[in-house]
Amino acid sequence: MKTKQDFPSINERKADGVREDGTPYRVLIVDDSMFVTKQISQILTSEGFDVVGIATNGEEGLNKYKELFPNVDIVTMDITMPKMDGVTALEKIIEFDKEARIIMISALGKQDLVKKSLMLGAKNYIVKPLDRQKVLERILMSLQQ
């Protein structure tokens, strides 16, 4: 029978967003919905990730990525945004940095754009509404690729 000592306390457990050396993974969030950016930010920071930037459209996301490069480990990118959509921003970021890890965020019914994004180099995708566990799983999977 397992006792309390067999389970790490919340303070002893390594946060998912922290590397073995203790440094956090750095995330850029690109989404035009303040609700979504706040939700992703809360999920990730609670697990030790460092949100290094937030952008509200693809053009701003591209510029922020270039400004922060190479200090971004992963990007979450909404597909449908003003000024520059997420697919175009993905394409331009991949042109700039072939090693970029980008996860697309999509509403239901955007499967054609999700497929196109994956073909262009996105590492994974998340479908809205966001689920905490799925967000963490997809990000951690993409970081290991």
What are the functions of these language-model segments?
Residues 1-26, 133-145:
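Non-catalytic signal-transmission and effector/linker regions of two-component phosphorelay proteins
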Residues 34-53:
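Two-component/phosphorelay signaling modules centered on CheY-like receiver
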Residues 57-60, 85-88:
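Acidic catalytic/metal-coordinating carboxylates
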Residues 69-76:
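Active-site beta3 strand of CheY-like receiver
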Residues 81:
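Receiver (REC) domain active-site loop signature in two-component systems and cognate sites
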Residues 128:
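A Lys-centered signature of the CheY-like receiver
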